[in-house]
Amino acid sequence: LQAGCPRRAYTIEEKLNSLRILFVGDVFGSAGRRIVREHLRHVVESNAIELVVINAENSAGGFGVTPAIADDLFELGAHVLTTGNHVWDKREIIDYMQSVPADSHERPRRILRPGNYVPGTPGHGSYQGTLPSGQQYAVINLQGRVFMAASDDPFRAADELLKHITARVILVDFHAEATSEKAALGWYLDGRVTAVLGTHTHVPSADDRVLPGGTAFQTDVGMSGPWESIIGVEREQVLHRFLTGMPAKFDQAKGDPRMSATMIECDGLTGRA
């Protein structure tokens, strides 16, 4: 937490029932997949992580996710994959997500698209599962509307999705552009979910905190990918577009890959962070 940001006092019961969650920020291209492959297992084992959630929407060359890449991330230890505005960039993911029924716990059911997409959109915006320990958990995926493509209201979508979730431990990936919109959702859901973590901007924010109701919040977890880039893309291509105003093809960068992730410790009985 930030210096000066007070920590909540934990009871003995909360410490005994503690659960650690790792959320890995937007995996960008082959460099992002490589750094996750090299470091995720060590991070999980050394920190006694029980639940791993990865945002995979940029994992296929920076644009979307394929079934093969999704399976690879599940093999590396992900329990659930979240996405965002690039979810449909690789069309084959649609059939993958629809290959199992809604009540399945197989891998295709555990990759989410934003839950505030219009009714009838393929896939699902939330998932509820059970860890080997018996601990129930849920993950909700939402997308912002400020400076983003049109979608339904994420606040009301969160209310609707929560009606069907019985787990106490609930993580929300809010894939959004505006800091204000992310903060607003964090406060709106404070005390009702375990964590609201922002994705999409690829820049990790230093505002991680636990809100008064026990909900962990961070504006953006950041990108797991090439830091020698402009948010994952080759620098020269982005600079050309800014300097000339002309269209430019964006290719994934490869240099200096780093993994950005946030760990949350919560009480498994109450869901409070």
Per-range role (PLM):
Residues I12-A273:
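Acidic, metal/ion-coordinating pockets
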Residues A3-Y10:
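Short, low-complexity intrinsically disordered segments enriched in A/P/G/S/L with frequent Arg
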